[in-house]
């Protein structure tokens, strides 16, 4: 199972002061998961992928654009802990 992960934003502030969208796409089924977020820290990506793991299972690989929020220690430790390759 391979997922793509990207961040969209900044957006105009709406209800709840959300400024970005975190988007994950299953590359086989093209299923989309989107989560509005208020900050772009790597913790938000970890939370989204924990939810994905609980519902769909552990992916083999996550494809990112290597943005700083996806290359920080917290996200890399999370992916190492689940043996997820980051491309």
Language model features with spans:
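Retroviral integrase
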Residues: 1-87
